[in-house]
Regions:
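Local cysteine-cluster metal-coordination motifs and their immediate loop/turn environment
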Residues: 193-208
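Conserved non-cysteine loop/helix-boundary elements of the Radical SAM core domain that shape
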Residues: 208-409
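Short beta-strand motif preference
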Residues: 80-81, 192, 308-310
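Flexible glycine/acidic-rich beta-alpha junction loops that bind and position SAM and/or redox cofactors
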Residues: 318, 322-323, 353-360, 375-399, ...
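TRNA-binding/sensing appendages of the translation machinery
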Residues: 403-428
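Short, conserved phosphate-binding/catalytic loop or strand-edge motifs used
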Residues: 131-136, 172-173, 207
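Radical SAM enzyme core and accessory elements
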Residues: 2-144, 148, 227, 441-527
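N-terminal [4Fe-4S]-dependent radical SAM core
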Residues: 119-123, 143-190, 241
Length: 527
């Protein structure tokens, strides 16, 4: 069955025909159709509903009288949430609007959240929080002078976050504090993207092309040429704006899907354009073992990378086949050991909880296998259902009920002396869970902290790149973005426009000649 999110203008006659018989809320977990109405009901109410129905689809058609639905309304004279099941109204809450628009928005979303908890029987681990950066809220509240008790109350009472999730967010904020305190107003990082892969994973919605396809393979060489030119222009833009580059990150896609000569060209450009000894960190996503051999690992090491990622996602051959990977778990083990042999001493490994065909026991096995390899970082993602991914189309009715138990397996990481150092959430993530980076002491990925907490500018190069310009000296102050063309062919064909847009970096920083502290905005993280 599909979960449908309906939008339309609401009138009093619609409420009248929904019925008014009230019975206790059902915990049957019925798949609801949702109607939202009113400016204050819009964005936050939609995403509150998506906590429970992440794969909801949009429509403008009101269901008939027999359909199950949720109605959330924000009018100048009424805030109302109503549930109808089996043709009968089973839950209704209403109240007059009070306070400013944000207070009314929170009141409506709280009623909607409480009702959906009752209808579905679900207690989301992050409560009604809709923001993707919970840790940032702690940093902001501390900056506002809030006490630790007030911050805890904000999470547990205002958001209805579970104590376990709050404790994790707080421990991450504590670990990040010294990193953020030493960040300077004119610091920045540079990201270079390689939007090519050996094959397409079923969960991926990224605009990446497979190098096995002849037409895609023909794009790789001109793409790498353009990327190297853009990196030179990026360095020039950083110099013109008086920015200090602290970290480099080459991601994808799969950067090692290019051949060894092209990888050497890219790495050589990075070494030529950027002062590598002055960097805090230089990460390259080696990614998949089916395109990462010893020669490429040596090139990455030779040109100064200080951190790499080798991303198994799972150590189950069956699950690897399910997601479209063309390698085995043994290939991952061999690649990791080769990386160690050539001298890589800071390695991250990614795992994903909730992949099709995986089990709690299978995920624990994958996690323990990664721990036994002893990498410096292990990042645990929760599967996110994205509409552009094959997984949504092919596995729409799959049962992902075990994913929460998989995520709880991260206790194994704590026992192995790993600690969480960064966290973010995504819309559409199964069970409203999170993605967490774990590290050994002293091996935090600084780029991940900087980009998640938005403490400094990220200059992006490559197709689909999004440069994020952050006002100096102001956490979460003014942010502007410069977008690159999304598709590889467009990026290559319109490359002159890409270069011209680099002028926007200096223009942004010309607004801040003194780079002084500016006022902090009010902290928020959803409602």
């Amino acid at each position: 069955m599909r979960r449908v999110l309906f939008w339309r203008y609401w009138h009093k006659r619609d409420y009248n025909r929904l019925g008014s018989a009230l019975t206790p809320p059902s915990n049957s977990g019925v798949l609801m159709q949702i109607v939202l109405r009113g400016a204050a009901a819009g964005y936050e109410a939609e995403h509150t509903a998506r906590i429970f129905y992440p794969a909801a689809e949009l429509s403008q058609t009101l269901p008939d009288d027999t359909a199950d639905l949720v109605l959330a309304v924000a009018h100048r004279y009424l805030l109302l949430v109503l549930v109808r099941q089996n043709g009968t109204t089973t839950w209704v809450q209403q109240r007059p609007p009070q306070g400013d628009a944000r207070t009314q928005e929170y009141a409506l979303c709280r009623m909607l959240y409480t009702m959906l908890c009752g209808v579905t029987g679900i207690r989301p681990p992050w409560g009604m929080m809709t923001g993707v950066r919970p840790v940032r809220i702690i940093h902001d509240l501390r900056a506002e002078g809030k006490t630790e008790e007030e911050i805890e109350q904000r999470f547990l009472q205002h958001f209805d976050c579970t104590p376990r999730r709050f404790a994790m967010a707080k421990s991450i904020a504590d670990l990040q504090r010294p990193v953020l305190e030493r960040a300077q107003p004119m610091d920045c990082s540079v990201y270079a993207g390689i939007p090519f892969c050996p094959s397409r994973c079923s969960y991926c919605s990224f605009v990446s092309r497979t190098v096995g396809d002849k037409s895609s393979r023909a794009l790789v060489a001109p793409y790498v040429d353009c990327l190297c030119k853009e990196l030179a222009a990026t360095r020039a833009a950083a110099d013109a704006a008086h920015l200090s580059i602290k970290t480099l990150y080459i991601g994808g896609g799969t950067p090692t899907s290019v051949n060894a000569q092209q990888l050497r060209q890219l790495m050589g450009t990075m070494a030529e354009q950027f002062d590598l000894p002055a960097l805090e960190e230089f990460t390259v996503e080696a990614g998949r073992p089916d395109c990462t051999d010893e020669e490429k690992l040596r090139i990455i090491k030779e040109y100064g990378a200080t951190r790499i990622s080798i991303n198994p996602q799972t150590f189950s051959d069956e699950v690897l086949r399910n997601i479209g990977r063309r390698h085995t778990a043994q290939d991952i083990l061999d690649c990791y050991r080769t990386a160690r042999r050539v001298g890589h001493d800071n390695i991250n490994m990614d795992l994903i909880a909730g992949l099709p065909g995986d089990t709690v026991e299978g995920f624990r096995h994958s996690l323990q296998t990664a721990i036994d390899l002893d990498p410096e970082n292990i990042t645990v993602h929760t599967l996110t259902l994205k509409r552009a991914s094959n997984l949504v189309v092919e596995h729409r009715d799959a049962d992902y009920a075990d994913v929460a138990a998989m995520v709880e397996s991260c206790e194994l990481l704590e026992k192995a002396s790993y600690r969480p150092y960064y966290l973010y959430r995504q819309k559409g993530t199964l069970q409203n869970l999170e993605n967490v980076g774990w590290c050994k002491p002293g091996y935090e990925c600084l780029y991940n902290i900087y980009i998640m907490e938005e403490v400094h500018t990220i200059l992006s190069a490559g197709a689909g790149g999004s440069t994020k310009l952050v006002a100096p000296g102001a956490r979460h102050g003014k942010i502007e973005r410069i977008f690159n063309y999304k598709y590889q062919t467009e990026y290559i064909d319109r490359f002159d426009t890409i270069l011209a847009r680099k002028e926007g970096v200096k223009q942004f920083y010309d607004q801040y000649p003194n780079c002084g502290e500016s006022a902090r905005p009010q902290a928020h993280g959803g409602v």
